[in-house]
Structure formats: structure tokens, C-alpha cells
Amino acid sequence: MIILMMCLLMPQAKSEGALPTETRSDAETSVRANSINATNEHTDDMHLTEAQYFDALSVLELEEMVQLRKRSGQYDDALRHLTILIKRVDDLDYHYEEALLYELKEDYAQAAQRYEAILTAPELSPVFRRNIQFRYGIVLSDMGLDRDALAVFRTVSRAKDLKSHEKLILEYARGVAYIYAGKTRKGIRKINKTLLKQNSDTGSWIEARARAALVYVLIEESERLTFEKPKKTAQRFQKRSELVGAAEEQIVVMINLGEPEYVLRSLVLLSEAYFQVAEEMRVAPPPPTLNREQQIRFQKKQLERADFIDERGRSYCAKGVGYSDQMGFKGQARLELEVCANEE
């Protein structure tokens, strides 16, 4: 039987697996060069009913259709094929693939339920169980349940046979969860230490996930520097520019890593940061030491600067949409960027 754990586990049988070194977005980015038209000779017979179509497919063909539709971003259709496959062969690998497809759809609640169900299976090998626990922790973090995710990661980290790169993957995951759980300094320390230790076996997806968390921290810190005090406006604008610039540098690294999921998430945050700065500049009060004429000039200049910054943020939205199309990646972040890019 073909093992359907291509996206996240390393390409060995599940008894020999390891913590995931590939991203769930690999399923989407494999379609970068050409969009796959997921059809075969069975779909040419348009007179076939749906039941007849599925009956005509062998187990091997169903597996192939699941993978084709997944690679082309047709997750609902992939799930339809997978449901038929599970009815024919109730295999844990297929249930894993089902959970993964829900992750790709960003339906994290459904993915979490399925990972939980798999973990109740008595026949899981220790390594396969560890993989599922890890994915479950990632999904919990994506649902905003970072304290629960940290508990899961701690359980995984107790395994005696973890390889060095698996420990690094876990440290990245824990650092990210710490940040989103509000333990920012601890999370940053973990991520920075892991960046110094990582190797080629660690996997680009988890590094990109960690860098996206750093972008979140940088943007959050920049937004705390408001322009309410006129005397500090110039100083705070400079500091915010530096923080946003540091966030941009992290995004460039993620682009080079080839991880669109986290690039797009970060571009949403970055564009929102620009819009926030622009909005605050429009309402920032002029220094009280200026006379009326100087205040008018100050406000006019602030409005011009705000318009420029606003346009800069919108340009990042448009670039994100273009990058998403180039990479063949779909998701909520892409939709948000598209809405932003098309706003007047």
C-alpha cells in the first residue's frame, strides 16, 4: 500500500519516521510551475454518475487522485476522494492524510479532532505517535491554544530517541508557542539560540514559522510607540521605521527559504503595520510650540507622509498577491492581501 505521508513526515515508512522537516505548504508549492488539471480517463466519461466514477477507480488511482488534487489546491475534492478511500481501506495513513488536508484548508479545528482520534489508536508505533503529537501541537498553536500546544511539545520532547535536528525543530516550535502565549522574551531566546544551532536537516518550514513569530513581535513592539506626544513623534517614527525594517528583513529570509505560508502571514502583519502608522500620523497633534501657520504646514506634511506610507502598505499587499500566485499558494492570508490590494 502506498504510504500517504508525503508532506510532513520524512519519506520513510512510518516506523522509521522523524519529526517533520518539510512544510505542509509543500503540497501547494509543488504546483508553482504548472497548475495541474487533476483529471484522468475516468472523468472523460461525463455520463458517469458520481457513484459510478468512484466505483471505477482502484485504490491506487484514488490515492493518485488525492495527491493530484492536493497539489493543485483542490482540497475539498481531495477529501471527497479520500473519504471513498477510507471507506474501502480503513488505514491510519489515510486518516493522517485527512487531518493534513484539513490543515491545508486552514480548518484547524477539524484537523485537531482528527489528530486526536488517530492518537487513540492502539497500534501506533512510538515514532508515528510522536509525529502525530507534534502535528497536533502545531495545529493547537495555529488555533491560538498555545499553552496547550506547549504541553504537547513537552510530551514529545521527553522521547529518549530524538535526533539532534528533531530537538531543534521542537525548540523552534516551543519558541513560537511561547511568543504567542505571551512569554515573548522566553520565546525570542529559544528561537535565537536555535537559529545559531540549526543545520540542513532542521527543515526550512519550521525556521520560517519561527521567523514569522519574530515578525509578529517586531510589529507588536512598533505599534506600542504611539505618536500621542508631539515632542516624541520624530523619534518614535524613526524607531518604528527601524522595527518595521527589521520585520521586512525577516520576510526576505522567509522568501529565500521558499515558505509562502509564513511569508503571506507576515505580509499581512507588515501591511497592517504601515496602515496603522499612516492612520496615527494623520491624527498626530502638532507640537504646541509652533504658531498657527507652522501647525498647518506640519499637518499638511504629516498627511502627505501618511498617504505615502499608506500606499507603501498597499503595495506590500499587491506584492503578496503576486507572490502567492507565483508560488501557487492559497489560504486566508492570500485572501486578506487581495482585499487590501483592491481597496480604493
Give residue spans per PLM region.
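Generic helix N-cap/helix-start motif at coil->alpha-helix transitions
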Residues: 54-62, 88-97, 125-135, 163-171, ...
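"A position-specific structural signal for the A-helix of alpha-solenoid helical repeats
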Residues: 64, 97, 135, 166-173, ...
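Short coil/linker segments at helix-helix boundaries
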Residues: 220-250, 276-312, 316
